[in-house]
């Protein structure tokens, strides 16, 4: 499959690796019990926790999805990655495949 890693550290240490380190301006976390996914009405067309976490991170950072240049998105299945693009607000619902 693949792998990704991020080193999070103080700015002074980051600058010892490169002169222009990336700064984290916002983070978001949202979890569900899994219960919503058991409801017959759940359509499996997105992940509400992803949308909630994205909104929280965007608000903290003072940005919108349109300001994002790069996303490292977990893709355990192709459809999961596509739905995450939509839930992150990177595209309209139903347009993630583009």
Please provide the spans of the model-predicted regions.
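Short glycine/threonine-rich loop-to-helix capping motif typified by GTGT followed
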Residues: 36-41, 75-97
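Beta-strand segments within the central parallel beta-sheet cores of soluble alpha/beta enzyme folds
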Residues: 19-29, 65-74, 94-98
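Weak global preference for isoleucine
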Residues: 7-8, 27, 68, 79-82
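Generic detector of well-ordered alpha-helical packing
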Residues: 2, 73-76
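Generic secondary-structure signature for well-ordered alpha-helical cores
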Residues: 12-15, 29, 59-63, 86, ...
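Generic hydrophobic alpha-helical scaffold/packing signal
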Residues: 55, 69-72, 82-85
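Condensing-enzyme catalytic core mediating Claisen C-C bond formation in acyl metabolism
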Residues: 1-52, 56
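Phosphate/pyrophosphate-binding loops at sites that engage ATP/ADP/AMP, CoA/4′-phosphopantetheine
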Residues: 53-67
């Amino acid at each position: 499959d693949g792998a990704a890693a991020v080193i999070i550290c103080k700015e002074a240490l980051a600058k010892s690796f490169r002169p222009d380190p990336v700064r984290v301006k916002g983070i978001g976390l949202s979890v569900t019990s899994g219960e919503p996914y058991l409801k017959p009405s759940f359509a499996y067309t997105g992940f509400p926790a992803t949308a909630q976490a994205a909104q929280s991170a965007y608000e903290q950072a003072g940005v919108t999805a349109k300001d994002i240049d790069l996303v490292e998105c977990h893709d355990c299945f192709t459809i999961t990655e596509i739905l995450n693009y939509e839930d992150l607000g990177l595209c309209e619902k139903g347009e993630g495949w583009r």
